[in-house]
């Protein structure tokens, strides 16, 4: 393929440049996307499957090369290895944006790889990665139903900003990443400072205009240079197979839908599927293959569930479309943790635990912008027993990381300033039961655990997951969706926030986009559900506890002059290690001179403060010091009153009586109380022990 390029101007100094034909020419599709000096490369390749499967084997891997920012990994191994949390989150964003664009029953193994090759420290690469991956797929042989593009939207100074720079984003009240087609939205994810539903909708509409512009440009490029699409890899569903399967299960599945609990419904559904396979699969007839029959069974189940909702307004568990599952809350739940809550909504349960600590508990990370440390982080755990299964235990998967980060963003906007609450905060959400919406249960349980721990949050936060049944030109929004509604429905729209406004949101769909009107209805219904949940939460715990747990460490801060930081640290950290050893406290010094002292007892904190003040304090005339005799002369003794601050106590100032032999009165190394009488023009200190006796 010859070198080809096109560009899309989004705003001043924000032009997307797409290039192909120079790099990775053996890939099915390969595109380099540039904006300023940030360059992101994306490739798309597909392979035939050795056997047909009932899912789409599609994988996206995004990697940020440290060399792109002129850096090298700080670890022992300098080669990029396991993906970072950020790389996993961006990979998920790309996957969720692109997956709805593929035809149903596409029998290909598809891989998209994206690399940040150059990073200017200003232009954020994730929207470029979505656009580049979409363009690479568009010009490849991989079949798609639609063209996709992605953008980021910010709100800076009351104005919407497209693809905000890093500096603009730090000042923004909104961080929204969204993807869609030229006419509809496919994926959104973001967090914000208590924006209203109307503002979020306005932001999405703003971003959609730019998405349409990029999609139109990619589509024109595809028509001009794209390869022939391989639609032969898409399996059709024979109409008679679907009809036979639907007729076979109609009455039986209607009976199964009468079961109101998850376990009974799943068991009945499993037995029905086994019956369908045993009775309808025909080895001699390829139309009635195992793959086709199983796919038809899933479609038939979905259609019956939808019909129940559309015709009767009743869901599989008996609820109405706006009804929230029963909620129970127990806080505190665990006796020795700093804060805890057992939050149960229907058959979804989160045991949330809050742990408070000093600076050494911060979550360290390394990315293209340098090293950092998170003062608040939420870790989500989804053990297999939560859904009654046997499974792998180990490092978190992409789903766990994504769910945890969404809940973390939802709660981060209500946390107090560090100056008011200097603790590092770790939240963990242990999912002990799951039947849909476990990430939003993590938000609710996590919020209550924070309040139980005495974290002075600005307001309680609750979360809810919304679903969609889109059929017969009718859109039905479902509140607080269960697992089967997520699995068989068309949308999963999670919204979290306070009574005042939204703090986080995430939407994934399984169809080719939804309209502004549907999102407006979903957000309005989510607000009603959120208000209901918040009301139940505040009935149990109306406000944060006034004090932290007696089991939490005590933390105090003190301010020193920045010129004294080196004195406190000492050569090679010798001085600060001595302070930690002598006091038993954890001491952390910031570049601005703020010192955080954490310990299990107040005595340890007081000791650490005393030692630090001794190193950094300035001498005051008239103040009494418990000094140390450093040397003895015939005319007096030299006494160190503060580290590095030494003065002379003349022999006449040692006692009210005459002292003939100083060595008989005091020895080198002895402690001696002295009062600072004066400081001469040379900075020399005049001390008196006699004055302390007079006092």
Swiss-Prot record:
<dbReference type="InterPro" id="IPR020568">
    <property type="entry name" value="Ribosomal_Su5_D2-typ_SF"/>
</dbReference>
<dbReference type="GO" id="GO:0005829">
    <property type="term" value="C:cytosol"/>
</dbReference>
<keyword id="KW-0479">Metal-binding</keyword>
<dbReference type="GO" id="GO:0006402">
    <property type="term" value="P:mRNA catabolic process"/>
</dbReference>
<dbReference type="Pfam" id="PF01138">
    <property type="entry name" value="RNase_PH"/>
</dbReference>
<dbReference type="InterPro" id="IPR004088">
    <property type="entry name" value="KH_dom_type_1"/>
</dbReference>
<comment type="function">
    <text>Involved in mRNA degradation. Catalyzes the phosphorolysis of single-stranded polyribonucleotides processively in the 3'- to 5'-direction.</text>
</comment>
<comment type="similarity">
    <text>Belongs to the polyribonucleotide nucleotidyltransferase family.</text>
</comment>
<dbReference type="GO" id="GO:0000287">
    <property type="term" value="F:magnesium ion binding"/>
</dbReference>
<dbReference type="Pfam" id="PF03726">
    <property type="entry name" value="PNPase"/>
</dbReference>
<dbReference type="InterPro" id="IPR001247">
    <property type="entry name" value="ExoRNase_PH_dom1"/>
</dbReference>
<dbReference type="InterPro" id="IPR036456">
    <property type="entry name" value="PNPase_PH_RNA-bd_sf"/>
</dbReference>
<feature type="domain" description="S1 motif">
    <location>
        <begin position="622"/>
        <end position="690"/>
    </location>
</feature>
<dbReference type="InterPro" id="IPR027408">
    <property type="entry name" value="PNPase/RNase_PH_dom_sf"/>
</dbReference>
<feature type="binding site">
    <location>
        <position position="492"/>
    </location>
    <ligand>
        <name>Mg(2+)</name>
    </ligand>
</feature>
<keyword id="KW-0548">Nucleotidyltransferase</keyword>
<dbReference type="GO" id="GO:0006401">
    <property type="term" value="P:RNA catabolic process"/>
</dbReference>
<keyword id="KW-0808">Transferase</keyword>
<keyword id="KW-0694">RNA-binding</keyword>
<keyword id="KW-0963">Cytoplasm</keyword>
<dbReference type="InterPro" id="IPR012162">
    <property type="entry name" value="PNPase"/>
</dbReference>
<dbReference type="GO" id="GO:0004654">
    <property type="term" value="F:polyribonucleotide nucleotidyltransferase activity"/>
</dbReference>
<feature type="binding site">
    <location>
        <position position="486"/>
    </location>
    <ligand>
        <name>Mg(2+)</name>
    </ligand>
</feature>
<protein>
    <recommendedName>
        <fullName>Polyribonucleotide nucleotidyltransferase</fullName>
        <ecNumber>2.7.7.8</ecNumber>
    </recommendedName>
</protein>
<keyword id="KW-0460">Magnesium</keyword>
<dbReference type="Pfam" id="PF00575">
    <property type="entry name" value="S1"/>
</dbReference>
<dbReference type="GO" id="GO:0006396">
    <property type="term" value="P:RNA processing"/>
</dbReference>
<dbReference type="InterPro" id="IPR015848">
    <property type="entry name" value="PNPase_PH_RNA-bd_bac/org-type"/>
</dbReference>
<dbReference type="GO" id="GO:0000175">
    <property type="term" value="F:3'-5'-RNA exonuclease activity"/>
</dbReference>
<feature type="domain" description="KH">
    <location>
        <begin position="553"/>
        <end position="612"/>
    </location>
</feature>
<dbReference type="GO" id="GO:0003723">
    <property type="term" value="F:RNA binding"/>
</dbReference>
<dbReference type="Pfam" id="PF03725">
    <property type="entry name" value="RNase_PH_C"/>
</dbReference>
<dbReference type="InterPro" id="IPR036612">
    <property type="entry name" value="KH_dom_type_1_sf"/>
</dbReference>
<dbReference type="InterPro" id="IPR015847">
    <property type="entry name" value="ExoRNase_PH_dom2"/>
</dbReference>
<dbReference type="InterPro" id="IPR003029">
    <property type="entry name" value="S1_domain"/>
</dbReference>
<dbReference type="InterPro" id="IPR012340">
    <property type="entry name" value="NA-bd_OB-fold"/>
</dbReference>
<dbReference type="InterPro" id="IPR036345">
    <property type="entry name" value="ExoRNase_PH_dom2_sf"/>
</dbReference>
<dbReference type="Pfam" id="PF00013">
    <property type="entry name" value="KH_1"/>
</dbReference>
<dbReference type="InterPro" id="IPR004087">
    <property type="entry name" value="KH_dom"/>
</dbReference>
């Amino acid at each position: 393929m010859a070198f080809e390029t096109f560009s899309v101007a989004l705003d001043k100094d924000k032009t997307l440049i797409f290039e192909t034909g120079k790099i990775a020419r053996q890939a099915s599709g390969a595109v380099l996307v540039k904006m300023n000096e940030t360059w992101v490369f994306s490739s798309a390749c597909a392979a035939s499957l050795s056997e047909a499967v009932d899912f789409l084997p599609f994988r996206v891997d995004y990697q940020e090369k440290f060399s792109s920012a002129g850096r090298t990994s700080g670890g022992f191994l300098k080669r990029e290895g396991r993906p970072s949390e950020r790389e996993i989150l961006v990979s998920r964003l790309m996957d969720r944006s692109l997956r709805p664009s593929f035809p149903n029953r596409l029998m290909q193994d598809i891989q998209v790889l994206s690399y940040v090759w150059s990073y200017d420290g200003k232009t954020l690469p994730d929207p470029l990665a979505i656009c580049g991956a979409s363009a690479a797929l568009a010009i490849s042989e991989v079949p798609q139903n639609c063209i996709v593009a992605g953008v980021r939207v910010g709100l800076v100074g009351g104005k919407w900003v497209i693809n905000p720079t890093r500096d603009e984003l730090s000042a923004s009240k909104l961080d929204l990443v969204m993807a869609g087609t030229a006419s509809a939205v496919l994926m959104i994810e973001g967090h914000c400072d208590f924006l209203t539903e109307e503002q979020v909708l306005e932001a999405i509409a703003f971003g959609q205009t730019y998405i349409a512009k990029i999609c139109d440009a990619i589509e024109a490029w595809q028509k001009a240079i794209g390869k022939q699409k391989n639609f032969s890899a898409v399996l059709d569903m024979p109409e008679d197979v679907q009809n036979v399967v639907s007729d076979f299960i109609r009455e039986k599945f209607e009976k199964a839908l009468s079961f109101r609990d998850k376990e009974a419904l799943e068991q009945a559904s499993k037995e029905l599927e086994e019956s369908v396979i045993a009775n309808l699969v025909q080895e001699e007839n390829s139309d009635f293959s195992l793959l086709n029959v199983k796919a038809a069974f899933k479609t038939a189940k979905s259609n019956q569930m939808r019909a129940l909702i559309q015709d009767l307004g009743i869901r599989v568990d008996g609820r109405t479309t706006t009804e929230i599952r029963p909620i129970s809350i127990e806080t505190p739940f665990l006796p020795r943790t700093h804060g805890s809550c057992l939050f149960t909504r229907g058959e979804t349960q989160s045991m949330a635990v809050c742990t408070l600590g000093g600076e050494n508990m911060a979550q360290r990370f390394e990315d293209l912008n340098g090293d950092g440390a998170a003062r608040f982080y939420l870790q989500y755990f989804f053990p297999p027993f939560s859904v009654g299964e046997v499974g792998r235990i180990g490092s978190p998967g992409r789903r766990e990381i994504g769910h945890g980060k969404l809940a973390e963003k939802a709660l981060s906007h209500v946390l107090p300033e560090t100056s008011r609450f200097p603790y590092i905060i770790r939240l963990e959400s242990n999912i002990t039961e799951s039947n849909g919406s476990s990430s939003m249960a993590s938000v609710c349980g996590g919020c209550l655990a924070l309040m139980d721990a005495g974290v002075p949050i600005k307001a309680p936060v609750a979360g809810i997951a919304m679903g969609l049944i889109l059929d017969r030109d009718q859109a039905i929004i479902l509140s607080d969706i269960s697992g089967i509604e997520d699995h068989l429905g068309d949308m999963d729209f999670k919204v979290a926030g306070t009574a005042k406004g939204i703090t986080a949101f995430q939407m994934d769909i399984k169809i080719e986009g939804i309209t502004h009107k549907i999102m407006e209805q979903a957000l309005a219904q989510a607000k009603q559900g959120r208000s209901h949940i918040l009301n139940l939460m505040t009935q149990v715990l109306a406000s944060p506890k006034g004090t932290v747990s007696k089991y939490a460490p005590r933390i105090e801060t003190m301010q020193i002059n920045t010129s004294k930081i080196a004195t406190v640290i000492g050569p090679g950290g010798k001085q600060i290690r001595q302070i930690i050893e002598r006091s038993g406290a954890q001491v952390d010094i910031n570049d601005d001179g703020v010192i955080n002292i954490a310990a299990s007892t107040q005595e340890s904190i007081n000791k650490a403060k005393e030692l630090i003040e001794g190193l950094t304090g300035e001498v005051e005339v008239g103040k009494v010091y418990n000094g140390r005799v450093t040397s003895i002369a015939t005319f007096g003794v030299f006494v160190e009153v503060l580290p590095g601050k030494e003065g002379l106590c003349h022999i006449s100032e040692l006692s009210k009586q005459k002292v003939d032999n100083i060595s008989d009165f005091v020895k080198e190394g002895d402690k001696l109380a002295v009062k600072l009488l004066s400081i001469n023009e040379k900075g020399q200190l005049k001390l008196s022990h006699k004055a302390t006796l007079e006092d």
